[in-house]
Each structure stands twice: as C-alpha cells, then as structure tokens.
Amino acid sequence: MIKKRKKNPYEASASGFYISMSAHKARRIIDQIRGRSYEETLMILELMPYRACYPIFKLVYSAAANASHNMGLNEASLVISKAEVNEGATMKKFKPRARGRSYLIKRPTCHISIVLEDISYEEYEEDFLRRI
C-alpha cells in the first residue's frame, strides 16, 4: 500500500511522467538542486551542460507557476523541499540487422516529481508558536 503524503498548504508540486531518459542521468541533476532556492535552481539548470536539465527545468518552472497562480505564494521565497526520480516503463523496439536478424533497443523512461515549499510561512509559524 502506498502512503499518501499529507498536503502542506504552503507546498506546490509538479510531476512529469514517462520522460524519455534514464533515471540514473536525471538523478545526477536532481541531487544538485535538492534543497536549493527556486531562483538558484533556475540558474544552475540553465548553466549545466546536460540534456536532462531541460525537462527538470520545465518541471521546476511549472511547480513555481502552480505555487504563484493556485496558492498565491511568492516565487522568491520558494525552496525545493522534495525532488525524486523513479524509473518508468522501458520502451522496446527492434532494429533490423543484416541477414534477417534484429537487435533489441531499449529506451528507458523516468518519472520526476518536484515539490516546492514556501519558507516565509515556516518562519511565521515558528514565531507564532514561540509567542504561545
């Protein structure tokens, strides 16, 4: 049974499914941006020379748009609180070879989920709890 995570009112998320790249290559990028601020993450992703950066950049940008449009959160105070990559289904196709043979080609896919959290509300809650 999969446990559903409790939804924090100051969190926004975006998920991408069946992205055609290896989960190992996507994890290399995700490990660099986990825990960083939104603006710093965008700068890092724009400057990294890997093909995996573009779909991750789009997901981070989409999660920030969800935060600002749906919840009214400020993009300057967003931090990547959770970023994970899971393996998806592997697409298989045959490449024709000489003498009637064929070789199997495997195209790995992955599922990426990004969660952004607003840290300004965290400070507000801590201050509120100290007063009580």
Swiss-Prot record:
Source species, domain of life: Eukaryota
Subcellular location: Plastid, Chloroplast
Membrane-spanning residues: none
A GO MF term: rRNA binding
Record keywords, A-Z: Chloroplast, Plastid, Ribonucleoprotein, Ribosomal protein, RNA-binding, rRNA-binding
Entry's Gene Ontology cellular component terms: chloroplast; large ribosomal subunit
Pfam families xref list: Ribosomal_L22 (PF00237)
Biological processes annotated in GO: translation
Database matches in InterPro entries: Ribosomal_uL22, Ribosomal_uL22_bac/chlpt-type, Ribosomal_uL22_bac/org-type, Ribosomal_uL22_CS, Ribosomal_uL22_sf
HAMAP family in alphabetical order: Ribosomal_uL22_B
Recorded family membership: Belongs to the universal ribosomal protein uL22 family.
NCBIfam families, sorted: rplV_bact
Self-association state and partner proteins as the record states: Part of the 50S ribosomal subunit.
Functional description taken from the UniProt entry: This protein binds specifically to 23S rRNA.
Protein name according to UniProt: Large ribosomal subunit protein uL22c
Lineage: Eukaryota, Viridiplantae, Streptophyta, Embryophyta, Tracheophyta
Gene symbol of the encoding locus: rpl22
